[in-house]
Amino acid sequence: MKTTKIVIASLVSLTMVSNPLLTFAATNDVIDNTTEITTDKETSSTQPTIKNTLKAGQTQSFNDWFPDDNFASEVAAAFEMQATDTISEEQLATLTSLDCHNSSITDMTGIEKLTGLTKLICTSNNITTLDLSQNTNLTYLACDSNKLTNLDVTPLTKLTYLNCDTNKLTKLDVSQNPLLTYLNCARNTLTEIDVSHNTQLTELDCHLNKKITKLDVTPQTQLTTLDCSFNKITELDVSQNKLLNRLNCDTNNITKLDLNQNIQLTFLDCSSNKLTEIDVTPLTQLTYFDCSVNPLTELDVSTLSKLTTLHCIQTDLLEIDLTHNTQLIYFQAEGCRKIKELDVTHNTQLYLLDCQAAGITELDLSQNPKLVYLYLNNTELTELDVSHNTKLKSLSCVNAHIQDFSSVGKIPALNNNFEAEGQTITMPKETLTNNSLTIAVSPDLLDQFGNPMNIEPGDGGVYDQATNTITWENLSTDNPAVTYTFTSENGAIVGTVTTPFEAPQPIKGEDVTVHYLDDKGEKLADDEVLSGNLDDPYTSSAKDIPDYTLTTTPDNATGTFTTTSQSVTYVYTKNIVAAEPVTVNYVDDTGKTLSPSEILNGNVGDTYNATAKQIDGYTLSAEPTNATGQFTSSAQTVNYIYTKNPAPEKGVVEIHYVDEDNKQLNSTTEISGTIGDNYTTEPKTIEGYTLTTTPGNATGTFTTGSQTVTYVYTKNIEAAEPITVNYVDANGKTLAPSETLNGNVGDTYKATAKQIDGYTLSAEPTNATGQFTSSAQTVNYIYTKNTNTDQPLPTKKPTNTTPTKPSNLKTTEVKKASDTLPKTGDSAPWKSALLGVFLSSTALVIWKKKK
């Protein structure tokens, strides 16, 4: 601005000399213009947010467009111009790329004029605000390492690259930037980052925000690099990020990490989380792996043949197998106290080995010729041989237990990079002789050059250099150890040797056994066994035994331990005290008495034994716990509790008595009983029959359902008395010869009637059918004589036509007509004819009279 004013003043002066009138007019114009420019600049510097108002095509200097001189210079440089040069707004809009990083810019006002920008780098300035609302063509934005508290990139829909690392952002909205492939928002104070709309992301870095608790990257299937370390994330799902080759998720609160789908990973840092297990066997491309500061107890790296770096610091690993990791260059197991063994003989490429504070007790380094850095502080190592590690530049084995360092001197590079202070050596325990102890100094105490180290006795010991021994006098077992220190000439090696000691072991005497018996020799209390050294005194003591009184104290109650076993016996007599009774009850589960109680009596301390009873219909539920015990001064009760037996289920057996034709011979018998009980059946004696078949189930067991027992009989063959069949009239007169029927007892007989002329059978006798028996039987067929049909008819008409009841007249059976034709001269036919005529005439006369 000052330059402009000087130029104008010079022009005015020159013009006034040559043409005073013209100069005066021009000077007024120039002064007016200068005043306007000065006013605009001052206004711009005091109010940088107010835009310059120029007409199209008008120009002004970069300093006028951009109030921050540093920013103006950077923009001018982009046009290969000076900040004092003028430029139009249209020209500013043509700039496509601007790199103004590390330029001490504090104000980016004027950036809105650079509407053509596609790439902006304003890294490492002091910018607090950045308005990019007019820079919608931006595809690349790097504004990291500033002091931005807010950044609005929603208008930048073409953005593919965004780096806002190391600012003071508390939120960031990238939902309108779907083309983003790179996003770095690390080292801010974001509490969340939503990248659900940024599916084209290949790199995402949000580490060191410290407050992000959730991160969803499942939509980012193209992601190759992810760094979300130093946050508070508890869950991380990378199963959809199959192209991932670099993952930093260390220093979070992750408890589980599934990497089965991430087989392209070459770099993995999951240290400082809460992982109890992790499976990396699918990650065969892995070259860098850090799982330090996790509570891991197991780790399988056998498939990681390309691994060059492995850190498992401060884990709970019990072991680590490195035999398959032949490309390993860096290995750290610092703080792994539970690892006791480590084999690195297959790791010939090792450059750095750090086993500080590990639990290893030995280490073979003979196959590691490329080893440069070796850290073994605070280990349990007792030996160290680095003679094959000629490239070593740094060795530290402070606070170990190593005596011989002679191999270190073979590597000149270690002379000034070697630390071995604080060695502690514990020697085997020694035995005092007359309270004195002389020990030889360990011949293995050699410095790095193979020389014996300087010895300084402690605890009042005296060192004899000629014999290389140390002697201590008047030692006490109150402090049962002596020490001496060793130091190398250059002081690089310092340590202490401790030798524990003990007094001579005394000779142990044989034990003394103390017995406690009653006057019958029965044991009343547990024996006591006294032990001690030979000739030491012993003292036994009596015991207080309830209900017993000590009656005999042995002579050897006190004495000394000897070379033979001894016995001490205290004898007691039982106190006689009548005890309260023991009542034994027999009840059901409701407390109802089932049988009279029993009362047991005795003296205190005596043993009682209660017994159960057999009670019909009941079963003892359980033996009471106090069925046996001792009488005491208090009354006791023993309860036997019974359960009522359920009603037994019955079975039925039917007994049948039949002949060979299954015909019933006697009534069926039925017996019943409890299922499971035995039954016995008996056959019956049946007259006229003999038992021929006794059934197989004549005896058996009652079962559910009905059973059938069948006895089969055969009829006896016995000639019966005859049966006489008579044919008589009512007076017993024989009308026809009798018939005699014969058969066997039990057989059936059937008598038959006869046709007797002039007689009719009155009735069938009831015993016409029956059975032969051993007694004679008679069957009588009784006949009635037929009425006589040859008597003449009465000629006199009866006067009384009412029939009278016949009296007890004997009926005469009409003689049956002959079945044969009458002979010549017989008169019977005409008599019949006359009788018919007579009857017909009589009937006709009677009929007419009635008419």
From Swiss-Prot:
GO biological process: cell adhesion
Positions annotated as LRR repeat: 94-115, 116-136, 137-157, 158-179, 180-200, 201-221, 222-243, 244-263, 264-284, 285-306, 316-325, 338-357, 359-368, 380-402
InterPro entries in UniProt: CDIRP, Cu-Rt/internalin_Ig-like, InlJ_EF-hand, InlJ_Ig-like, LPXTG_anchor, LRR_dom_sf, MucBP_dom
Gene Ontology CC: extracellular region
Effect of a null allele: No visible effect on colonization of host tissue culture cells; decreased organ colonization in mice.
Summary of the function given for this chain in its UniProt record: Involved in several steps of L.monocytogenes infection by both intravenous and oral infection. Probably acts as an adhesion; upon ectopic expression in L.innocula bacteria adhere better to human cell lines.
Protein name per the record: Internalin J
Lineage: Bacteria, Bacillati, Bacillota, Bacilli, Bacillales
